[in-house]
Amino acid sequence: MLRNASAQILKQFVRHRTTDASLTLEKSINKVQILGRVGQDPVMRQVEGRNPVTIFSMATNEMWRSGEGEPVGAGDVTQKTTWHRISVFKPGLRDVAYQYVKKGSRIFVEGKLDYGEYVDKNNVRRQATTIIADNIVFLSENLRDQ
């Protein structure tokens, strides 16, 4: 019974099955969810011949107490901040993000990871990791009231 249920669930993720390993097409998952604060007001950029994109940075924090297992207040709290680049391509969401996302806003972003390359102004090839946003939820009170 459990085997049949598992097989049915797995079939939902398989689009095409074949005996030839080189022709196997299977569904995969690339999903990111982050909750944090916006680090800068968004900018909208457009490269000739391409659709515009709204870009902003977002910070997430990880905190831990150095004295785990000690009484509350006994250990020092350490915090690590990680910065993320968010890109919004979806036309409706792109425009809303450009208009309403502001520095300091607390937001929740769902999307996917994307890795790319670009050439900087000094003609040096650089790697870039970005989150392509599919959904943004505004959590700051002042933004929900606008």
Swiss-Prot record:
Principal location class: mitochondrion
GO CC field: mitochondrial nucleoid
Protein name: Single-stranded DNA-binding protein, mitochondrial
Keyword annotations from UniProtKB, A to Z: DNA replication, DNA-binding, Mitochondrion, Mitochondrion nucleoid, Transit peptide
Domain SSB stretches: 29-140
PANTHER family, sorted: SINGLE-STRANDED DNA-BINDING PROTEIN, SINGLE-STRANDED DNA-BINDING PROTEIN, MITOCHONDRIAL
Gene it is expressed from: ssbp1
Transit peptide region: 1-16
Record flagged with keyword Mitochondrion: yes
Phenotype when the gene is knocked out: Morpholino-induced knockdown results in reduction in optic nerve size and mitochondrial depletion. Strongly reduced expression of the developmental regulator genes isl1 and atoh7 in retinal ganglion cell (RGC) precursors. Nonphotoreceptor cells, both in the ganglion cell layer and in the inner nuclear layer, display compromised neuronal specification, whereas cell numbers in both layers are unaltered.
Pfam families, per database record: SSB
DNA-binding listed as a keyword: yes
Summary of the function given for this chain in its UniProt record: Binds preferentially and cooperatively to pyrimidine rich single-stranded DNA (ss-DNA). May be required to maintain the copy number of mitochondrial DNA (mtDNA) and play a crucial role during mtDNA replication. Required for retinal ganglion cell differentiation and retinal integrity.
Location of the protein in the cell: Mitochondrion; Mitochondrion matrix, Mitochondrion nucleoid
